[in-house]
Amino acid sequence: MNNIIREITNEQLRTDLPSFRPGDTLRVHVKVIEGSRERIQVFEGVVIKRRGTGVSETFTVRKISYGVGVERTFPLHSPKIDKIEVKRRGKVRRAKLYYLRNLRGKAARIKEIR
């Protein structure tokens, strides 16, 4: 029974995703359906967490929009995600970057890996 579940979930995993970690800056291209139209919406921000394994793996991206912090959680293997681009590699020493929620401006910057 366990092997059957593993096979089915492995079929649903995507292989076209780049490797990324918390601290990296991503551009997530999401398919949005408005009425009868479908378009691509881009959400760019810093990965603050990544959790789960397999089909249930999710990641959260945070950005500042008009002075307000916006966080969005995406299922990693979702068909709604068109593509993911890694813009910058960040150097952090934590797996969960919740402390960024309390920082403003230049204090919220993350060092870039060269």
Curated annotation (Swiss-Prot):
Transmembrane segments: none annotated. The keyword Ribonucleoprotein applies. GO terms for molecular function: structural constituent of ribosome. Pfam families: Ribosomal_L19. The keyword Ribonucleoprotein applies. Keywords: Ribonucleoprotein, Ribosomal protein. GO terms for biological process: translation. GO terms for cellular component: cytosolic large ribosomal subunit. PROSITE patterns: RIBOSOMAL_L19. SUPFAM superfamilies: Translation proteins SH3-like domain. Belongs to the bacterial ribosomal protein bL19 family. This protein is located at the 30S-50S ribosomal subunit interface and may play a role in the structure and function of the aminoacyl-tRNA binding site. This is Large ribosomal subunit protein bL19. It comes from Halalkalibacterium halodurans (strain ATCC BAA-125 / DSM 18197 / FERM 7344 / JCM 9153 / C-125).
